[in-house]
Amino acid sequence: MAENQEALAEFYDKGVGVWDNLSREHMHFGYYAPGATATIGGHRASLVRLIDEALCFAEFPDDPEKKPRNMLDVGCGIGGTCLHVAKKYDIQCKGINISPEQVKIAQGLAAAQGLESKVSFDVGDALDMPYPDGAFDLVLSIHCIEHLQDKEKFIREMVRVAASGATIIILSHVHRDLSPSEQSLKPQEERVLRKIGSSVQAWFCPLSNYVSLLAPLPVEVIKIADWSRNIDPSSRLMLKVAFSVKGIVSNLMKGVQGWTAIKNVLPMKLLHKALHDGLVKFVVLTCRKSN
């Protein structure tokens, strides 16, 4: 395993539990109508809505006869997406994660929900996945590609394991695209991204890079959308809870994991501001592997 991948695995191992008081088995933002107010009581519904909205955007078939045979979640966290998709859509789901600790938790959640026959999880590297070519009808990734420096290899691997005609979905933070007159981001913008990235093991690029990386690959029907305003209420709520007295005390009671949680929350304030300022965006990209 490459050195930066080992660091990423350690980061995720230690980061388990950062959002579990609010997000439970999901390690991503929720989806809301722009301008909505997020509430703790309704937050879990917004988390699964993000998954459903992504599938809808990718034109997930309503006809049960045309639904995918199986799904791969690349960078699956503690398994929430696989568990939701397996239950709601009744398809086989597999998750891969570089963090042994998170895979262990995901396996426990699957067992607790009686889904061992429909859901499984592997410890593995997203840049070198242990699956044959064309193994999956749906390949999805949420909040993973921004944590990897070699984005070209990541995208190639997603396309490689996708079957002919399979749907590929990527949800990710990116930085703003450059204007025609710009050669690079402003120095202050680069400093902000470095500060966020160094804290949460992330390397940001513009959305146009993803499209360019897909261009030479056997894919078609590329669709993109900016969902920054849709996750804004979720981001606000997560920060509010994390910085509340209850949130801080709850994390401190977790010992080492709690200190890690607090350290990981601090750059979230920078990320939220970068989203508000338009420096960072949250996007969805889908495409279909050519037949």
From Swiss-Prot:
SAM motif III: annotated segments: 161-170
Function noted in UniProt: N-methyltransferase involved in the biosynthesis of ajmaline-type monoterpenoid indole alkaloids (MIAs) natural products, important plant-derived pharmaceuticals used in the therapy of heart disorders. Catalyzes the indole N-methylation of ajmaline to produce 4-methylajmaline. Also able, with a lower efficiency, to mediates the conversion of norajmaline to 4-methylnorajmaline.
Top enzyme category: transferase
Location of the region described as SAM motif I in the Swiss-Prot/TrEMBL record: 71-80
Tissue: Mainly expressed in roots, but barely detectable in stems and flowers.
Pathway named in the protein's UniProt entry: Alkaloid biosynthesis; ajmaline biosynthesis
Gene3D superfamilies in alphabetical order: Vaccinia Virus protein VP39
Motif residue range(s): Vacuolar targeting signal: 133-139
Compartments, as annotated in UniProt: Vacuole membrane
Predominant localisation class: membrane
Disulfide bonds: none
Record protein name field: Ajmaline N-methyltransferase
KW Methyltransferase (keyword) present: yes
GO terms classed as biological process: alkaloid metabolic process; methylation
CDD domains, A to Z: AdoMet_MTases
PROSITE patterns (alphabetical): SAM_GTMT
Keyword set, alphabetical order: Alkaloid metabolism, Membrane, Methyltransferase, S-adenosyl-L-methionine, Transferase, Vacuole
Natural source organism: Rauvolfia serpentina (Serpentine wood)
pH dependence: Optimum pH is 7.5.
Temperature dependence: Optimum temperature is 30 degrees Celsius.
